[in-house]
Amino acid sequence: MTIMLTPMQTEEFRSYLTYTTKHYAEEKVKAGTWLPEDAQLLSKQVFTDLLPRGLETPHHHLWSLKLNEKDIVGWLWIHAEPEHPQQEAFIYDFGLYEPYRGKGYAKQALAALDQAARSMGIRKLSLHVFAHNQTARKLYEQTGFQETDVVMSKKL
């Protein structure tokens, strides 16, 4: 089966936001950038700031990743500023729900994104990946992404 990018609907967005807010908070704690007691509130604020109008926030594109009309296997969110000098879009969030991982769907989704991005006039895709997420890093490298900046921290 082939992954389809379909514009996220309101109910899908609500479910996505609940899931991803929690997951992002956990990842920030795991990365050591947020304290556990602050993480949920900070995560909610990040998403409120980035998507003040939800699905209607200009230049943000949120898709459900589907195998067919009803089976949602994941999500993908990009920001594509039309006036960006490099015609670049930033992947804010991308993921598959646990039962669908390791089946090749992530590569299919990124290939579908490449095609959609080209049709939007985008010439470059960028993203952030947590250093501890070796699976994601490997996926991105296998699909043509390269490191451009590295941020490092040291606990004292």
From Swiss-Prot:
EC number in record:
2.3.1.-
- Per UniProt, the enzyme's principal EC class comes to transferase
Q: How does it assemble?
A: Homodimer.
What residue stretches are annotated with the N-acetyltransferase domain?
11-156
Gene3D superfamilies recorded: 3.40.630.30
Concerning PROSITE patterns, the annotation shows: GNAT
PANTHER family named in the record: N-ACETYLTRANSFERASE DOMAIN-CONTAINING PROTEIN (PTHR43259:SF1), SPT10P (PTHR43259)
Pfam families in the record, alphabetically? Answer: Acetyltransf_1
Q: Which UniProt keywords apply?
A: Acyltransferase, Transferase
Task: Please report the name of this protein according to its UniProt entry.
Answer: Uncharacterized N-acetyltransferase YycN
Q: Which InterPro entries match?
A: Acyl_CoA_acyltransferase, GNAT_dom, N-acetyltransferase_domain
